[in-house]
Amino acid sequence: MEAIKGSDVNVPDAVFAWLLDGRGGVKPLEDNDVIDSQHPCWLHLNYTHPDSARWLASTPLLPNNVRDALAGESSRPRVSRMGEGTLITLRCINGSTDERPDQLVAMRLYMDERFIVSTRQRKVLALDDVVSDLQEGTGPVDCGSWLVDVCDALTDHASEFIEELHDKIIDLEDNLLDQQIPPRGFLALLRKQLIVMRRYMAPQRDVYARLASERLPWMSDDHRRRMQDIADRLGRGLDEIDACIARTGIMADEIAQVMQESLARRTYTMSLMAMVFLPSTFLTGLFGVNLGGIPGGGWRFGFSLFCILLVVLIGGVTLWLHRSKWL
């Protein structure tokens, strides 16, 4: 396989273009650098930038059927072998504070043993971990270890978000035990986040498993073993998501039951109040519509006696309800 010159991957508006030094570090790519399997290149692009879009559409370093995928037309996690290279689409947690974490960010990459091209539109937060290791000189030394480190960082961020959702569910369950109902829409949003994670992380787990089983020339047995460990770890996260989705269904039923019981208690209370005041309401209405005049209206103690009668009547009804165990 021929070496690539640094000038062949010179993209002015690239997010960064680095040359791996083979010892865990990087240096900025220069035009006179030689790119080979011992010193692979990592070119990271935002495919919406004009120079990056033109380079993706015109460079002879990429197969024709890879260009559209790197330009944003592939969204679900997948892996495809393209001759000597491999096209991979992955999803990561959104680190933007203006958007929800479950609005996952897509990262697309094409790589072989000497050349890595990764593209994105929104920032891929998990790449910061890999970039930090490379800048400190403790990062990947070749393309195989780079891919393993990237997948490991993506899985770490996904696992952290799954753990956050799990903690929210535990808090929600504790509040329900205290008869505290969550705000409207809270449980629906939580369930949606779990379903979105399940939708994209399941095929991503399959991508990891396939990378672990594929005999890619630039991945060693140790790389494949680590990739299988990452796939297993994400699989355990998916099991946790499935359990959380089931628990949200149970909590939805519990919330509906709590609200129904609360409504039943209020209805029962209003019914008892109506039963207590119904006799007194009947008497006051009867006296008020008496066409021949209100009985005792001319007696100065008539109103007082009527009030005492109402109090006794209400007390009698209340006592009867209490003895009947309605109160």
From Swiss-Prot:
Presence of the UniProt keyword Zinc in the record: yes
Record-linked SUPFAM superfamilies: CorA soluble domain-like, Magnesium transport protein CorA, transmembrane region
GO molecular function: cobalt ion binding; cobalt ion transmembrane transporter activity; magnesium ion binding; magnesium ion transmembrane transporter activity; zinc ion transmembrane transporter activity
Keywords linked to the UniProt accession: Cell inner membrane, Cell membrane, Ion transport, Membrane, Transmembrane, Transmembrane helix, Transport, Zinc
GO cellular component terms listed in the entry, alphabetical order: plasma membrane
Membrane topology: Multi-pass membrane protein
Transmembrane parts of this sequence: 274-294, 301-321
Subcellular location field: Cell inner membrane
Catalytic activity: Zn(2+)(out) + H(+)(out) = Zn(2+)(in) + H(+)(in)
Cystines in this chain: none
Source organism superkingdom: Bacteria
A UniProt-annotated Pfam family: CorA
Topology feature Cytoplasmic, residues: 1-273, 322-327
Principal localisation: membrane
HAMAP family the record matches: ZntB
Family listed: Belongs to the CorA metal ion transporter (MIT) (TC 1.A.35) family.
Name the UniProt record assigns to this protein: Zinc transport protein ZntB
Biological source species: Salmonella newport (strain SL254)
